[in-house]
Amino acid sequence: MTQFASPVLHSLLDTDAYKLHMQQAVFHHYYDVQVAAEFRCRGDDLLGIYADAIREQVDAMQHLRLQEDEFQWLSGLPFFKPDYLNWLREFRYNPAQVCVTNDNGKLNIRLTGPWREVIMWEVPLLAVISELVHHYRSPNAGVDQALDALESKLVDFTALTANLDMSRFYLMDFGTRRRFSREVQQAIVKRLQQESWFVGTSNYDLARRLALTPMGTQAHEWFQAHQQISPDLATSQRAALAAWLNEYPDQLGIALTDCITMDAFLRDFGIEFASRYQGLRHDSGDPVAWGEKAIAHYEKLGIDPLTKTLVFSDNLDLPKAVELYRHFASRVQLSFGIGTRLTCDIPQVKPLNIVIKLVECNGKPVAKLSDSPGKTICHDKAFVRALRKAFDLPQVRKAS
């Protein structure tokens, strides 16, 4: 299946902010590290028939480059260094790093190459896959249907929050990777800009064009890669946390907690990290239990939770965000990142549950265990066992 009308992507910045944040850190600290990453469809969708169309889009991505106005805009942000931005100016996607195949109906994608380059593929490639699939499956759906669905949800949201003090409720768009289309994401974000509680987007292109705050810090791959970069597996998570502070000592300080598990993370998140990081991000497991653990941890360390921020971003929708806000608002600062339930929430359209995750670093396995067993990713069961042993976790979950 080929011949999509035109390139899906129009800007190198059409990606999530944390990709550039991590890329700069990799550029400065791990320039020669090599990685491999793989695509996973967590649902039962047979996406292999789209392999040729995806390959065409991958080839088209080599023509994307940082434009002068984009370079100038990034230069005005406080956390990017000139050496990195000058390098990014010359960056081009290399399609040879991407192998796309149709394996009896199953879509296989493997990415290999220097981490500083491979890191850029994940988000735009997932957005391409999502848009292509929805273009063929739902040709009559689009912006109008997405906005109608959003308006209905906003009516319900207004009723749900009528008696709530919403002055500390902050919502972000995290919807790039599984969006229905680029046009739908832009329309949704532009509509949400009218709401006082909407504070930004993870998409750098939209943030620039719509004068929004770009949102994001780091992803699982930052912690995964350190499992092989660090000489000691048991201290790899602490090494990742320390390296991030080395690159961003006073900014972008929200730490992702579930690469191993929340309990393992908190054992590593002592006073030296907890005092310097601005907060934590939830991405798997029970969000209420996670939030209670985070607050208790801060209190145990003598840190006032109201000086810290908890970011919730796992499978959220507006009602779930309100429920969490009701539970935690008086005890800690809060932000909510909603993705698929904003940018691909259209009647009769089934969103894709797709990811691209790191599987190797410098030729050796890495793993994501998470607080949700179904999200475990690793080929090497022996490495998963070693990881669980290093972090004092029971040997119960299997790698997928």
Curated annotation (Swiss-Prot):
Organism domain of life: Bacteria
Family, per entry: Belongs to the NAPRTase family.
PTM section of the record: Transiently phosphorylated on a His residue during the reaction cycle. Phosphorylation strongly increases the affinity for substrates and increases the rate of nicotinate D-ribonucleotide production. Dephosphorylation regenerates the low-affinity form of the enzyme, leading to product release.
UniProt cross-references to Pfam families, sorted A to Z: NAPRTase, NAPRTase_N
Species whose genome carries this gene: Salmonella agona (strain SL483)
Name this protein carries in UniProt: Nicotinate phosphoribosyltransferase
Molecular function via GO: nicotinate phosphoribosyltransferase activity
InterPro entries the record matches: N/Namide_PRibTrfase, NAPRTase_N, Nic_PRibTrfase, Nic_PRibTrfase-Fam, Nicotinate_pribotase-like_C
Residues with the Phosphohistidine modification: H220
Gene Ontology cellular component terms for the protein in this record: cytosol
GO biological process, alphabetically ordered: NAD biosynthetic process via the salvage pathway
EC number: 6.3.4.21
Pathway: Cofactor biosynthesis; NAD(+) biosynthesis; nicotinate D-ribonucleotide from nicotinate: step 1/1
CDD domains: PncB_like
